[in-house]
Amino acid sequence: MTYLTRSPWILHYDASSCNGCDIEVLACLTPLYDVERFGILNTGNPKHSDIFVVTGGVNEQNREVIKNIYEQIPDPKVVVAVGICATSGGVFRECYNIMGGIDRIIPVDVYVPGCAARPESIIDGIVKALGILEEKRARMRQPDTGKKATGGETV
């Protein structure tokens, strides 16, 4: 991986879950795990973010919210689905209002399975997302060759 030209910013959104993965995402920001050592910064504004980290599954109420946030993030952007609920719907999959994983409504680049996903796995997924982000940035600088982007990498 080449050196980053600027620090990537992540935006975390909890769709609908037990909040176990949210606690683990927040643990990544503490001094014990210190995700900022990779140059990653947390933001609350989608217009400033590069990496969209989603925990929890999609339900009828948050479907449009997730799409709206995704559309506000400038290109190139990377989506990381954290936890089994975000990847497939998890234990709530059979509930009447759960549609499934995040990939039902927006494209996902990195999947971090687990219930709850461990901070080490989340950091590994975000570091993989950094590589994908740099690839997407490089492709945006080059003329279109007609090749499709590969995604859906599992950590």
Where are these regions (language model features)?
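Iron-sulfur-associated redox domains of electron-transfer enzymes in respiratory
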Residues: 1-155
